[in-house]
């Protein structure tokens, strides 16, 4: 999300981007990391923000075991569940 946003905004390809997935806390974590990088001299300028993308996609599917597999497991991601 961050990398694509930067590229679409016209930032050069040499500028990096990091996507943080902490559900509701993603935007706050992004601001915290940007602030830390500036305070420590790791960056002069940072762009930080957040997007909400979980409301419409609470269920996710794991990668298939093999190509064309029909054995699909669905997991509830609304509470931050990870794949087993």
Predicted regions and their residues:
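Helix-rich "cap/lid" substructures immediately adjacent to catalytic or cofactor-binding pockets
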Residues: 2-4
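Acyl-thioester C-C bond-transforming condensing/cleaving domain
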Residues: 6-84
């Amino acid at each position: 999300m961050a990398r694509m946003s930067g590229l679409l905004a016209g930032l050069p390809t040499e500028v990096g981007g990091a996507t943080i997935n902490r559900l509701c806390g993603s935007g706050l974590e992004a601001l915290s990391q940007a602030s830390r990088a500036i305070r420590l001299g790791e960056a002069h300028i940072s762009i930080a923000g957040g997007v909400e993308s979980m409301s419409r996609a609470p269920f996710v599917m794991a990668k298939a075991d093999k190509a064309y597999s029909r054995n699909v497991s669905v997991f509830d991601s609304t509470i931050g569940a990870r794949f087993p």
